[in-house]
Regions:
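Hydrophobic faces of well-ordered beta-strands that scaffold small-molecule active sites
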Residues: 101-103, 146-148, 173-175, 198-200, ...
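Conserved alpha-helical substructure of the radical SAM core
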Residues: 28, 41-68, 75-189, 193
């Protein structure tokens, strides 16, 4: 038995971790708010739940960071306030409170990345007060993880204040950066503000290749320096690479992973190029094939099974139909620099502007339009041509709410991903 497989019993026997989930699940079972009885009584329901949990965690590496357990950056660390919020929100009766929200707090960026999803969106930068109000609405809505992105979020002088606002209200704040502009004094201010995790973009172990892909000379050196500083400051430290076809076919992720390990990175993230932003009109050759996806999923599982560091987090594995699927608009939301509320940063469907209207009705509209439940497949990968047809006719990007709802209606619903199918019906869904 692998050593890290023994961690799960230790976690489940820790009352600091299980106290709130057990209390919430018992309360929900008594009130009948959720069909959770099969998970709380002996028999086949519990066995199915344990079987799926085992299959999921078999490909994950649970690690410790500053006294907390971390599965991966999709979930908050535990025990902790943000983790407890996941379960306490179930008691509120709110319709599918979002687990996470990513905020593009600026569109300003000194880089020109080949895959940028923000290109063609409106630019600008809202004042501090607007974002502080919005952070209050997000945490009232039940968000557990708040990610600050851009543009380059480090260009905002008030970033520590925004981080502190999220942390003080019980969320786990994360920062996504190129590393540009990060120095020791700023890192300390972010740490004091409550930043939990820091993710730095790093696409290649070859400096010239990384600089070329990011459109900025010195990008590699800035990224490496930021990763070292992140570890020294005590953040949960992640690197993130965008996987081109050549990245997979030539196994460039292997020397990049070795570099990340040498820098003390704790999580090695791999994201697919998406048909949006700069790539919205790209042909299929720019996107990964099913064979590429299978290769990255294999790397995720096999590397994590070995128990070394860093753990691998390939999005196309975590968000696969066999696990959690696509939670854009039902478990996750994205707000761009202009305030447009979208399912994720890759899906240019706006359901309202959070600087012009209250957030909760916008969230509910988006949640219902996206089908009320997580989808088995990535929405933008499946329906980018439909989105582009609407964008070409309307000349708007992201699409306004009325057109976004029409896109969702034409896209239709999908069966639940296997995890959620098990929760609601005690069995997996079809492909």
């Amino acid at each position: 038995m692998r050593l890290h497989a023994l961690k799960l019993p230790l976690i489940l026997l820790n009352p600091a971790i299980t106290r709130v989930p057990v209390r919430v699940l018992r309360s929900l079972n008594r009130s009948g708010k959720r069909a959770l009885s099969s998970l709380e009584t002996p028999g086949a329901g519990r066995w199915r739940a344990l079987k799926l949990a085992k299959a999921w965690l078999d490909g994950e590496l649970i690690t410790r960071h500053r006294g907390q357990w971390v599965i991966n950056s999709f979930l908050p660390p535990f025990p902790g306030k943000a983790f407890d919020r996941l379960f306490e929100n179930l008691l509120s009766g709110r319709h599918l409170s979002p687990v996470s929200a990513f905020l593009a707090v600026t569109s300003e960026c000194p880089y020109d990345c080949w895959h940028c999803s923000m290109k063609t969106r409106a630019g600008g930068e809202r004042p501090t007060a607007d974002w502080l109000r919005l952070l209050g609405e997000l945490t009232d809505l039940g968000v557990s993880v708040v990610g600050f992105t851009g543009g380059e979020p480090l260009t905002r002088p008030d970033l520590p204040e925004l981080v502190a606002a999220a942390a003080s209200r019980g969320a786990a704040p994360m920062l996504f950066t190129t590393g540009f502009g990060l120095d020791a004094p700023l890192a300390k201010r972010l740490k004091d503000a409550g930043l939990w995790a820091l993710c730095v973009s790093l696409d290649s172990h070859v400096p010239e290749e990384h600089d070329r892909g990011r459109g900025h000379r010195g990008a590699f050196d800035a990224a490496v320096a930021a990763l070292r500083l992140s570890r020294a400051t005590g953040f949960y430290t992640m690197s993130a690479s965008v996987a081109s076809c050549g990245y997979v076919e030539e196994k460039r992720y292997l020397p990049l992973y070795a570099l990340a390990r040498s820098l003390g990175v704790q999580e090695f993230r791999i994201v697919e190029p998406m048909p949006c932003g700069k790539l919205k009109d790209a042909d299929s050759d720019a996107l990964l094939t099913p064979a590429h996806v299978d290769e990255l999923r294999r790397f995720h599982v096999e590397t994590n099974r070995k128990g070394g560091s860093p753990k691998v987090c390939a999005f196309n594995h975590v968000e696969s139909p066999e696990l959690f699927g696509c939670g854009g608009g039902t478990q996750h939301l994205f707000i761009d620099a202009a305030g447009e509320v979208c399912p994720c940063d890759f899906t240019p469907l706006s359901f309202g502007n959070a600087f012009a209207a209250p957030l909760e009705p916008i969230w509910l509209k988006m949640n219902q339009a996206m089908g009320d439940n997580p989808r088995r497949h990535c929405f933008i990968q499946r329906h980018h041509k439909l989105v582009q047809d609407f964008a070409a006719r309307s000349g708007e990007y992201p699409l306004p709410p009325e057109l976004s709802c029409q896109v969702c209606e034409q896209a239709g619903s999908e069966p639940l991903p296997d995890y959620f199918a098990m929760i609601t019906a005690g069995k997996g869904a079809g492909k």
